[in-house]
UniProtKB/Swiss-Prot annotation:
Highest classification ranks of the organism: Eukaryota, Viridiplantae, Streptophyta, Embryophyta, Tracheophyta
Protein name as it appears in the record: RNA cytidine acetyltransferase 1
Entry's transmembrane regions: none
Domain N-acetyltransferase: 548-731
Cysteines paired by S-S bonds: none
Region Disordered: start-end pairs: 989-1028
One GO term describing the cellular component: nucleolus
Natural source organism: Arabidopsis thaliana
Enzyme class, spelled out: transferase
Length: 1028
């Protein structure tokens, strides 16, 4: 049955066409696809030009194939099964055949950037992300339609509980329940969009779109050819410059007055040919920045510039730039293949993007793409174009600037990567230095001429577009003006940290929405690269939490307090041992839990993932409160909070438990039909800001952080006692920075681990020691180009030591033996170098060896910071002297002098070790230990005398024993013999023995006695001769 379309729908579309504003339709129902034909028909009748083109975006499958033959077979089968009404089937089939429909997968949505369509159809709502939403809606021209197709819903509030595809990335092992806060806020925001209609698949308007009940038609202009004031000014500009070559033909390609003025400004700088001139172009998304840059580059080629370099985060970002370079060449009547050639990349990652254009009409000219970190290739450049500079880190952008003409464009609000830091920091610095005298400015940017251009008028649609305002508010894109200056700057010690309740923050209440816009403005103005997807991560991810640092709050004033600092924290860890072992075995890490998985991978440790920790995702300080200590105060308060110093962890206070989840829209909505459902923001919400003393903290073992490694950021975190454990060896292709992760153990972890209480790193100390050794070994290869100041900060070596007594017991860990480190020949060469007898080249190998030992703190020798830096550059990074001169700004003679001082100090210590080793090999007298007597000398003498007297008395008694004296008695015969005997002249006396000899003498014995007598006789003779 035919049904008349609601007149308000037709009026909304016609008003959009007249005002060049876009309209949005949300169609709910299984037959929502059939209403696209009607909406397209209404739009076609309203516009004067040909049928509007259609962009159809989907997740992975279309209900009806986009291929003609496949679609015919598919429709035939559906008709036979009775799944389609023949009348509607013919209408939709005719629609697909007649209308120019571009089908695009969500994952391939980047290829539609820069294109323009009349209608954008989005199906598969569960696959949508904020980035996809902004990217696809941005392609619709003024007067066009945005159509969102939803499956049949019992109520609109069921969108809030819909499981989105992106939620899979938000879930972790310990946090598995993702919320639907973003969908709830999206649904509530539809009621505030004056150009949005929510209806069912029969085009019945739902109560959520009650705001269009009073819609009226916009009066039609009497003169359809009448131009707006901006269009008249653009026409006047084109007529004035029409005869000027080459700027005239290029201005004719411009669509808005802002774009035309930008091209004129670029061309003035080109013709001026002044070195050190910078022209910055900043605007929101869809203002024609890239097109203006492309036309300006074509003009530079016509003006005779030979070497032009173009850079962006990726060659895909330069698609529009190169496209308008070619359009500019067409306007200047350059012929492709005859006067210029286009070279495309063969790198599959660049998707055949244009990377080079060779021009050879007048002389050889080149337009070449380079990556942002390849600034060393800019030696011969005449013009450098930097597109999407907001997505490139500030240090990299600064390294690209030099004594040549620079065109720079930046997106200050959009969806590819926004950042006010470029305009707030770099552009402000350029403005200040352009006013300063050349002699009074230091650095590479001194004396530069600076111009800034801002584009406000959109290319595709007119100003005041309601869809743009709604999208900017929903995704917090244009929040630069939402950040007021702080009323005062209190002392950091007077500030307090508050926990932000996310249910209240994303409830779409007026005050909560203003607070959210200010928070996102702080994040955009920081050094982080921002994306609309970050908003959905903040709202739906179960492990993420928000904290804000506020000054003293005056409760008597009914106004929101000034936000000085925002901290986004992600809870990680509590991973089972089984999951950790599986990850190590398969070499794959799930989404989330960055620090635990990376720690597990680096140290092959399955215990650390079981610990619970918090990763600081971002910390953003108000741009007008930088360098005032607010960031440090926020980190200190957060650390104390998780250590239980602000709110007790161990106490079992029920009122301090995590607040219960409030009633959601889905629970608050009345159980009514879709056509009667009233959607309103929730009431009775908990407080937006919760003091930390009123909320129990999670029990954590550590706090971590991950960021792109820069010197200022690393020093900030090291100041707060965070220690690194991982630095990626491969720098980012976009930023040129190495990813760095740091940890800080909390005091609660010391209660669960056996650690040295004197070591502030606790259980993390051995891992940090291992990291330093690995990092020092990689400095000569993967980190060879790292700035020496950053390398010194990462290593954090101990360079001041007390005097070490080599003769005594030196502390453990110091080098005590030269065996295996330096040979005697090495020591002799080293001695000769310290005595100025040989050149440094002769001991360069020794320098590398000793550098590794010194930075492992095995050589307790005190060095100055400059001396240690030179030793690091030569010994660890193995840099040449030219590189050291350039980095440290020292003369070569000064470097040699520093090396000699270092050598003398190291040789003194090593020579002491060698001397000690030599002394240990020499023989030594045995040391006798003299102990004091236990008795005095007099007592010792008395005891000795007593012992001697007793011995003498016992001996006398033995001698006077009668039995012993009997052996000396003289017998009768002996007495008689003595009386009668006389000594003969020979002197021999014969005594007859009374004892009988029973043994017979042996002949051999006789011989021996004879021989003995002979010997005695000979001996007697010799003695007589000696006496004579």
């Amino acid at each position: 049955m035919r049904k008349k379309v609601d007149e308000r729908i037709r009026t909304l579309i016609e008003n959009g066409v007249k005002l060049r504003h876009r309209s949005m339709f949300v169609i709910i129902g299984d037959k929502a696809r059939d209403q696209i034909v009607n909406l397209h028909h209404i739009l076609s009748k309203s516009v004067v030009k040909s049928n509007p083109s259609v962009l159809w975006c989907y997740k992975n499958r279309l209900d009806i194939s986009s291929h003609n033959k496949k679609r015919a077979k598919q429709l035939k089968k559906m008709k036979e099964r009775g799944q389609l009404d023949p009348e509607k089937l013919d209408a939709f089939s005719l629609f697909l055949d007649v209308v120019d429909v571009t089908h695009c997968l969500y994952k391939d949505s980047e290829r539609i950037l820069g294109n323009t369509f009349g209608i954008c159809i989005l199906q598969d709502f569960e696959a949508l992300t904020p980035n996809l939403l902004a990217r696809t809606i941005e392609t619709v021209e003024g007067g066009g339609l945005v159509v969102l197709l939803l499956q049949s819903l019992a109520s609109l509030t069921s969108l809030c509980t819909m499981v989105m595809d992106v939620h899979d990335r938000f879930r972790t092992e310990s946090h598995s329940e993702a919320s639907g806060r973003f969908n709830e806020r999206f649904l509530l925001s539809l009621a505030s969009c004056k150009a949005c209609v929510v209806m069912d698949d029969e085009l019945n308007l739902l109560p959520l779109s009650s705001h269009i009940k009073s819609i009226t038609k916009v009066p039609t202009k009497e003169d359809s050819e009448a131009l707006s004031e901006a269009e008249r000014d653009l026409k006047s500009l084109k007529d004035a410059l029409n005869d000027d070559f080459p700027v005239g033909p290029l201005i004719n390609k411009c669509c808005t007055l802002d774009q035309g003025k930008a091209v004129v400004t670029f061309f003035d700088a080109i013709l001026d040919k002044t070195l050190r001139s910078i022209v910055a172009l900043i605007a929101s998304r869809g203002r024609g920045k890239s097109a203006a840059l492309g036309l300006a580059v074509a003009g530079a080629v016509a003006a005779g510039y030979s070497n032009i370099y173009v850079t962006a985060p990726s060659p895909d970002n330069l698609k529009t730039v190169f496209e308008f370079v070619c359009k500019g060449f067409d306007a200047l009547e350059y012929k492709e293949h005859l006067e210029y050639d286009v070279v495309r990349s063969v790198n599959p990652e660049f998707n055949k993007a244009i990377v080079r254009i060779n021009i050879f009409k007048q002389h050889r000219q080149t337009i070449q793409y380079i990556q942002p970190h390849e600034h060393e290739k800019l030696s011969q450049v005449e013009l450098l174009v930097i597109d999407e500079a907001a997505a490139i880190p500030l240090p990299v952008v600064k390294s690209l600037l030099g004594p040549y003409l620079v065109f720079l464009s930046s997106t200050v609000s959009g969806y590819e990567g926004t950042g006010r830091s470029l305009s707030l920091k770099l552009l402000q610095q350029l403005e200040e230095q352009s006013r300063a005298p050349v002699t009074g400015v230091e650095g590479s940017l001194s004396g530069c001429l600076f111009k800034k251009i801002e584009l406000s008028e959109s290319i595709r649609y007119a100003s005041g577009d309601p869809i743009e305002s709604w999208l900017n508010g929903l995704l917090c894109l244009d929040v630069a003006n939402c950040l007021p200056n702080p009323a005062c700057h209190p002392l950091p010690s007077q500030c307090d940290l508050y926990y932000v309740n996310r249910d209240t923050l994303f409830s779409y209440h007026k005050d909560s929405e203003l607070f959210l816009q200010r928070m996102m403005a702080l994040c955009v103005s920081s050094h982080y690269k921002n994306s609309p997807n970050d908003l959905q991560l903040l709202s739906d991810a179960p492990a993420h939490h928000l904290f804000v640092l506020l000054g003293p709050v005056d409760e008597s004033k009914n106004q929101l307090p000034d936000i000085l600092c925002v901290i986004q924290v992600c809870l990680e860890g509590q991973i089972s041992r089984k999951s950790a072992e599986k990850s190590l075995r398969e070499g794959h890490s799930p989404h989330g839990d960055q620090i635990p998985w990376k720690f597990c991978e680096q140290f092959r440790d399955v215990v650390f993932p079981k610990l619970s920790g918090a990763r600081i995702v971002r910390i953003a300080v108000h741009p007008n409160a930088m360098k005032m200590g607010y960031g440090s105060a926020a980190v200190e308060l957060l650390t104390r909070y998780f250590e239980g110093q602000l709110a007790s962890i161990s106490e079992g206070d029920d009122e301090l438990e995590v607040e219960p989840s409030p009633v959601r829209v889905t629970e608050a909505a009345a159980k009514v039909s879709l056509l009667e459902e009233q959607i309103k923001p929730r009431a009775n919400l908990p407080p937006l800001l919760v003091p930390l003393r009123d909320r129990r903290p999670e029990r954590l073992h550590y706090i971590g952080v991950s960021f792109g490694l820069t010197l200022d950021l690393f020093r900030f975190w090291r100041k707060h006692k965070f220690a690194p454990f991982y630095i990626s060896q491969i720098p980012s292709a976009v930023t040129g920075e190495h990813t760095c992760m740091l940890l800080k153990p909390l005091t609660l972890s010391n209660d669960e681990f056996e650690v040295d209480e004197s070591d502030e790193l606790g259980f993390f100390a051995p891992f940090y020691k291992d990291f330093r050794i690995r990092f020092s070994k990689l400095l000569s290869d993967k980190f060879k180009k790292m700035d020496y100041k950053l390398a010194m900060s990462v290593l954090n070596p101990k360079i001041n030591f007390p005097e070490v007594d080599l003769t005594g017991n030196s502390p453990d860990g110091f080098l005590k033996k030269l065996d295996g480190v330096l040979s005697p020949y090495d020591m002799e060469r080293f001695r000769a170098y310290t005595a100025n007898l040989v050149d440094f080249n002769l001991v360069y190998d020794i320098c590398k060896t000793l550098a590794h030992h010194y930075f492992q703190e095995k050589l307790p020798v005190s060095l100055s910071y400059v001396q240690a830096s030179v030793l690091l550059c030569l010994g660890l990074q193995e840099s040449d002297f030219s590189s050291i001169e350039r980095q440290m700004q020292l003369e070569r003679g000064q470097i040699y002098s520093l090396l000699l001082k270092v050598g003398k100090k190291l040789y003194k210590y090593l020579n002491g070790i060698a001397t000690k080793e030599l002394e240990s090999t020499l023989p030594r007298l045995k040391d006798r230990v003299l102990e004091p007597h236990k008795v005095s000398v007099d007592e010792d003498l008395r005891e000795g005398a007593k012992e001697v007297e007793e011995q003498m008395r016992a001996r006398i008694e033995e001698l006077l024993d009668p039995e012993l004296l009997d052996q000396f008695a003289i017998g009768d015969k002996e007495a008689e013999a003595l009386q009668k005997s006389k000594i003969s002249s020979s002197g021999l006396i014969s005594i007859e023995s009374t004892k009988t000899d029973n043994k017979k003498e042996k002949p051999s014995g006789f011989d021996k006695s004879a021989k003995k007598r002979g010997n005695d006789k000979h001996s007697s003779t010799s003695n007589k001769k000696r006496r004579a």
